[in-house]
Regions:
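Acidic (Asp/Glu)-rich catalytic clusters
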Residues: 1-2, 30-35, 48-67, 84-99, ...
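N-terminal small/glycine-rich loop or linker at the start of catalytic domains
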Residues: 1-18, 66-72, 109-119, 229
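Active-site mouth loops of central-metabolism enzymes
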Residues: 8-25, 44, 71-83, 121-130
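Active-site beta-loop-alpha junctions enriched in small/polar residues
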Residues: 10-12, 44-46, 70-75, 106-108, ...
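Structural motif corresponding to alpha-helix initiation and N-cap regions
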Residues: 23-27, 48-52, 76-87, 163, ...
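Short, well-structured secondary-structure segments
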Residues: 39-45, 64-69, 101-103, 151
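Acidic/histidine-rich catalytic cores of soluble enzymes
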Residues: 41, 133-232
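Active-site acidic/histidine proton-transfer and metal-coordination neighborhood
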Residues: 79-181
Length: 232
C-alpha cells in the first residue's frame, strides 16, 4: 500500500498563538508544502472555510486536504448539541474528500488555559470514563454514518493527555472511535510512544509524527510550564 504524507500548516503559522508566523501567507504555506514533497495539508485558521473557496485553492497547489482539527466538547454537551456544532466542519471535510476529522475534546478548558501550568489541566474522574466512552462512541458512530470518521487526538492540556488516559479511552469506547496517534504528545506527557502504539495499533486511523527536544521538555516539566509556554 502506498503511503502519502501530509503536513500541518502549524509548521508555518500557529493557530493557538497567531503571532507565531502571523505574517506568513497562505500562498507561502501551500507552495512550500508542495515543494517539500507533501501530498496534502491539514487545515489552518488562515484557510478559507468553504469547500467552494478552499477546494480550488488546494487544487491550484496540487494538494489535498488531509483533515482538520475540531475543538470538541462532548464531555460538556449532549450528542445532539455537539453534532449541531460540528456539522458545518464535517460538511467541509466531506465535501473535500477527507476520510477523518481530528477530534480533540477541549471540555473543561477556557481561553488561555494552554498557558496554565501543566499540572492544572482538566481530568476526568474515575467514575466518568464509562459514560464518557458511551457518549463519545455514539458521536463517532454518527460521524461514520455521515461519511467522515473520528480520529480522536490525545493532546497536552486536555482530558485525554497521558498514555494511561488513552488506554482508558480505548477501553471505554467502541471501534467507531479511531485513534489519532501522536508521538510528540505521548512524549510530552511522560509516556512511551512505542509501547502506546503497540497496545492500540488496531485503533489507529491517523498519525502525527512529532518529536520533542529533551532539554526543553525536562525544563518545562521541572518548572510546571504551560503547554504553549513550553512551545515558546
Amino acid at each position: 500500500m502506498a503511503i502519502r504524507l501530509g503536513i500541518n500548516p502549524i509548521t508555518w503559522s500557529n493557530d493557538d498563538l497567531p503571532s507565531l508566523g502571523g505574517d506568513t501567507t497562505v500562498e507561502t504555506i501551500l507552495s512550500e508544502t508542495w515543494a517539500a514533497g507533501f501530498a496534502g495539508t491539514e487545515m489552518s485558521f488562515k484557510f478559507p472555510k468553504t469547500s467552494r473557496e478552499l477546494g480550488p485553492l488546494l487544487k491550484r497547489h496540487r494538494l489535498e486536504l488531509v483533515s482538520a482539527w475540531y475543538d470538541g466538547r462532548i464531555h460538556e454537551r449532549d450528542i445532539e448539541a455537539e453534532w449541531a456544532a460540528i456539522l458545518p466542519h464535517m460538511t467541509l471535510l466531506r465535501d473535500l474528500g477527507c476520510a477523518y476529522v481530528v477530534y480533540a475534546d477541549t471540555s473543561l478548558r477556557s481561553e488561555g488555559d494552554l498557558f496554565a501550568p501543566i499540572s492544572r489541566r482538566p481530568k476526568l474522574a474515575d467514575g466518568e470514563w464509562a459514560s464518557y466512552g458511551k457518549r463519545l462512541t455514539a458521536l463517532a458512530e454518527r460521524m461514520a454514518e455521515f461519511g467522515v470518521r473520528m480520529a480522536f487526538h490525545h493532546h497536552m492540556g486536555t482530558i485525554v493527555e497521558t498514555d494511561q488516559e488513552v488506554d482508558r479511552l480505548m477501553a471505554a469506547t467502541g471501534p467507531a472511535v479511531g485513534l489519532l496517534y501522536d508521538t510528540g504528545h505521548s512524549i510530552f506527557s511522560g509516556g512511551d510512544p512505542v509501547a502506546l502504539l503497540k497496545r492500540h495499533v488496531g485503533r489507529v486511523v491517523h498519525v502525527h509524527c512529532k518529536d520533542a527536544r529533551k532539554d526543553l521538555l525536562v525544563g518545562a516539566r521541572a518548572t510546571d510550564e504551560g503547554f504553549m509556554q513550553a512551545v515558546l
